[in-house]
A protein has these predicted regions:
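A conserved beta-turn-beta hairpin within the catalytic core of GNAT-like acetyltransferases
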Residues: 62-70, 79-80, 130-135
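Conserved GNAT acetyl-CoA-binding A-motif
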Residues: 88, 95-108
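Conserved acetyl-CoA-binding loop-helix of GNAT-fold acetyltransferases
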Residues: 74, 80-93
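Short amphipathic alpha-helix that is part of the acyltransferase structural core
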Residues: 1-45, 49-55, 141
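Conserved active-site tyrosine of GNAT-family acetyltransferases
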Residues: 20, 115, 120
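Conserved catalytic-core motifs of GNAT/GCN5-like acyltransferases
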Residues: 104-106, 121-139
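Conserved beta-strand in the GNAT
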Residues: 47, 53-61, 66-73
C-alpha cells in the first residue's frame, strides 16, 4: 500500500533527494548545480513510499497566496501506475487546505499533458530553465 507523507524527517528528506538524483541528474542529465537550490531548505517536501521503499516525491513552495509545486519525480519502476497523479492530488489538496488560491508549476514540455489532466493550463512560451530541457509555466485555481 502506498503512503504519502510530509517529509519532515532527515531520513524522509534524504529519500526525496535520492529520488530526484535518480530521475533528474542520472536519467535526465541535469547538472547537480541546477537541481539543488535554496528552496530545498525552506519548502515542504512530500514522499510517496510503500514497503519496497521511496517511489515519488514533490515539493511545495509558498509564494504569497500561490503554491509553487516542483521537483515532481516518480521512480522508474513506479511510472505508469497512477502514482504521479496520486502524489500531485495529495499536494494539491494540501495546498488547498493551506489556504492557497492558485497552484503554479514549471512543467517539462514532455509532461504538459499529464498536468493538463490535473487541471493546469499552460501559459506563455516554452523556455529553457537552464537545464537544457524545455519548460512552460502552468497554473490552476485551487478554489
Amino acid at each position: 500500500m502506498v503512503r504519502i507523507i510530509r517529509a519532515d524527517t532527515t531520513t524522509a528528506r534524504s529519500q526525496c533527494f535520492a529520488l530526484r538524483r535518480a530521475v533528474f541528474i542520472q536519467e535526465q542529465g541535469i547538472d547537480e548545480a541546477e537541481e539543488w537550490d535554496a528552496d530545498d531548505a525552506t519548502c515542504t517536501h512530500y514522499l510517496a513510499h510503500d514497503d519496497s521503499g521511496p517511489l515519488a516525491t514533490a515539493r511545495l513552495i509558498a509564494k504569497g497566496d500561490m503554491a509553487k509545486i516542483g521537483r515532481v519525480a516518480v521512480a522508474k519502476q513506479a511510472r505508469g501506475t497512477g502514482l504521479g497523479r496520486q502524489i500531485m492530488t495529495h499536494v494539491l489538496a494540501q495546498a488547498r487546505g493551506g489556504g492557497f488560491a492558485t497552484a503554479m508549476l514549471e512543467a517539462q514540455v514532455s509532461v504538459i499533458g499529464f498536468y493538463e489532466a490535473l487541471g493546469f493550463v499552460a501559459e506563455g512560451p516554452e523556455y529553457d530553465d537552464g537545464s537544457g530541457i524545455l519548460h512552460r509555466v502552468m497554473r490552476r485555481p485551487l478554489a
